[in-house]
Amino acid sequence: MRTDTPQAVNLADYRPFPFAIETTRLVFDLHPTRTRVSAELSVRRTGGKNEPLVLNGERLKLVSIAIDGRPLAAGEYGVDAERLTIAEAPDAFVLTTEVEIDPSSNKALMGLYMSGGRFCTQCEAEGFRTITYFPDRPDVLSRYSVRIEADGKFPHLLSNGNPVASGSLDGGRHFAEWSDPFPKPSYLFALVAGDLDVLADKFITMSGREVALRVFVDPGQASRAAYALDSLKRAMKWDEEAFGREYDLDLFMIVAVRDFNFGAMENKGLNIFNSSLLLADPQTATDLDYERIEAVVAHEYFHNWTGNRITCRDWFQLCLKEGFTVFRDQGLSADMRGAAVQRIKDVRALRARQFAEDAGPLAHPVRPSSYLKIDNFYTATIYEKGAEIIRMLKAILGAPAFRKGCDLYFQRHDGEATTVEAFIACFAEASGRDLSGFFGWYEQAGTPSVTIETAYDAAAGALTLTLTQSTSPTPGQPDKKPLPIPIAIGLLAADGRVLRDTEIVLLDQAQMTVRWDSIPEPPVLSALRGFSAPVNLSTDARPSDRYVLFGSDTDLFNRWEAGQTLARDLILTRAAGAPDEVGEERYADALGRALVDDAAEPAFKALLLALPSEPDLALMFEAADPAALHAARDHLRTRIAVHLGDLLRRLHGEMQINGEFSSDAAAAGRRALRNACAEALSADPHAENLARLLGHFGAARNMTDMIGGLYPMVAMGGVPREKALESFHHAWRTEPLVLDKWFAVQGRDPNPDALERVIALTQHPDFEPTNPNRLRALVSTFANFNPARFHDPSGAGYAFLADEILKVDAFNPMTAARLVEPLGGWRRYKPELGDLMRAQLERIVAHPNLSKNVLELASKALG
Ligand code: ARG
Ligand code: ZN
């Protein structure tokens, strides 16, 4: 048994920090193994007379400490593994500390570490405390000035704010000084030092100020940063137009690093990115990479207002910046790439990640009230469901009142660290609405289930809708209350004509009825249009109603949704042993008609052609059997490939683009549809299709087509798989981002020998477990996206994942913890599997020296 039970942090225990840190002066003397950091904090007491000054600090070697220049004697302060305490601090003073740290041994990639021979930092959420002693909490805002000294081998010395001085020093060393005029919390501090190439540009803001833009990348990679730089300019413009937000410093910098625990980080004026979300050219990046780069560059830039100018009072308020900022980046993507297609992709991701989380032992409210490690709460719930809540707020208030609320928030809370309550209060005030019930969305975990029953009275020409909602219990929340759910509803006639336009019905009780008159004929219900709320909807619709929606709903989201629901029901029925052959034919016919609709965009058709994923299907199942689902889904794939073979081959040919590559949404849509056709045809691998697929892979001139061709080759197994993987590896062995794709495609390999091969790949010379991208490409792809092989009846897939978690936890707890989730759903699987999953969680929890990160998630998963 472990004796050191970690302490939970509770929202209810929030207390302001009893001191203000008005200015923070940092001097870095950089050295790979012995970096000196001296900090000069001007401290002023704001709380009670007897409050001690307690600063966070971990893994620091304290070299000296002084108050107002006077070194402290041993009895005047205390240091332990997590903090520095000065019991009797004056009311106003300057505290100077000097510490030594070792960036090169830092494989947790938090704080100051080295990547590719360069220094870089990641401080959110609690990394700053491994750099210097400081109140490392988001509500302590300070003005920073930074001096960096380093060897000439590190030519670029970067930090937040504006550059104020630079020059050379003795012994081949040099320095740079930076000053950030905006008070900020420590988690937004950043430093980068090293040899980098830079791509430069400028942006003129709406008030006419010129901002210098710089993107720093590995030497030789500057051309690959052009798309990110262009995305940045579009994001800056969009934020001015959509939210009236202007950039505030004279300089905005982005740096790409290869070793990074997550996507990117919004440090003030100096964003740091995982290189996988920054570098792109047609040869090495897929359209999905381009799409994500556009979204993440925007996301981090948007944080400058939603996160940096207005930050979080404490980490329980994380959704205040993350949910709002995801909402904002989704808005940009919708404007750049088409609202319907973007919405479908966002909802697909929401269901795959957030609905799964909300349905399992790791379910938590968008604003949680307790945690062990805040790093475990950078979840789909905080981010994606957090964004859905803002989207509902906008739907309920209407766009003008929503914008007024945003303006009020920006004006009232600028320069503050605030709360979700304060944010919602701005919308209540701006709209004059009572939003107290709405707040339940932040406090209640779980995905609500909504049912709608319809009764049509032909004589009266009236339709009665009976709407009900309920939410199942989640850990720690046995009883759920009704939430205000905006449900966008329209009506179609049986022949697809519009009978009634979209209207938002606000379901804010457990049950309510709505009566609509003047409905001249029996209607087909199109409910939850645009996925107007993050709920599971069930209605009394018959398959024939769904075919009406699939064929003609004006709401493209619901058109897609109808197709998915039809396919899902057919797969689940077959997996349960009662196949509906006639229904499968009918579905394939309707899909064929949708694919030849000239009015629909290729990107939309590509989405229609993608069947519901296996993990999504498993969510719909009690006691899920991944093998049966895989087989049933494959059966429908084959049925479609056979039934629509001619059409799919024709489209595959027509969508081919000859001529120059364009990364725009229209061209990407054509490539997506062509790849979807290839994927579909691979389910019927006769000679003609095989030749076509080989041609697709062999002739690919960009990475989107290449990956679209590689997966079917891998899925075929045998000689095509070996040959394709070998030629791909040979071509790309020196490009880390492309090699990640090579590992990922093998993580998704559906062949029966995939697990064995994945385990063997962990011994491949190119497998670098200390690099999170490489690790996730193989291990996380396998565990999350290859259910048929991960859920091997022997339990070997689970044991493999547990082995990897324990190995990685020894040096990078944060990345290890993110691998726990696939085991967390054990209760949803059939008991033979669930028991084996649980056994691996028990093995993990029993492991000595487990990190708090993994301990928290694995023990919660055991429930
Ligand atoms: N704030 C960053 C973003 O969303 C992510 C930081 C993740 N930090 C963490 N400890 N998981 O853009
Ligand atoms: Zn963010």
Swiss-Prot record:
GO BP annotations, alphabetical order: proteolysis
Q: Which Gene3D superfamilies match?
A: 2.60.40.1840, 3.30.2010.30, Neutral Protease Domain 2 (1.10.390.10), Peptidase M1, alanyl aminopeptidase, C-terminal domain (1.25.50.10), tricorn interacting facor f3 domain (2.60.40.1730)
Q: Pfam families from the entry?
A: DUF3458, DUF3458_C, Peptidase_M1, Peptidase_M1_N
**Which reaction(s) does its UniProt entry say it catalyses?**
Release of an N-terminal amino acid, Xaa-|-Yaa- from a peptide, amide or arylamide. Xaa is preferably Ala, but may be most amino acids including Pro (slow action). When a terminal hydrophobic residue is followed by a prolyl residue, the two may be released as an intact Xaa-Pro dipeptide
Molecular function (GO) terms listed? alanyl aminopeptidase activity; metallopeptidase activity; zinc ion binding
* Catalytic activity, EC: 3.4.11.2
Question: Is Nucleotide-binding tagged as a keyword?
Answer: no
Keywords, ordered alphabetically: Aminopeptidase, Hydrolase, Metal-binding, Metalloprotease, Protease, Zinc
Q: Cofactors per UniProt?
A: Zn(2+)
Which residues does the record give as substrate binding sites?
124, 263-267
- Residues annotated as catalytic: 300
Cofactor mode of binding and number, as noted = Binds 1 zinc ion per subunit.
Binding of Zn(2+) occurs at 299, 303, 322
Task: Please indicate which residues carry the site annotation Transition state stabilizer.
Answer: 383
Show the InterPro entries listed in the entry: Aminopeptidase_N-like_N (IPR045357), Aminopeptidase_N-like_N_sf (IPR042097), PepN_Ig-like_sf (IPR038438), Peptidase_M1 (IPR001930), Peptidase_M1_dom (IPR014782), Peptidase_M1_pepN (IPR012779), Peptidase_M1_pepN_C (IPR024601), Peptidase_M1_pepN_C_sf (IPR037144)
SUPFAM superfamilies per UniProt: Leukotriene A4 hydrolase N-terminal domain, Metalloproteases ('zincins'), catalytic domain
Q: Which residues form the signal peptide?
A: none
**What is the protein's known function?**
Aminopeptidase N is involved in the degradation of intracellular peptides generated by protein breakdown during normal growth as well as in response to nutrient starvation.
The cross-references to NCBIfam families, in alphabetical order and at most eight, read:
pepN_proteo (TIGR02414)
Q: Which family does it belong to?
A: Belongs to the peptidase M1 family.
Name recorded for this polypeptide = Aminopeptidase N
Q: Which organism is it from?
A: Caulobacter vibrioides (strain ATCC 19089 / CIP 103742 / CB 15)
Gene that encodes it: pepN
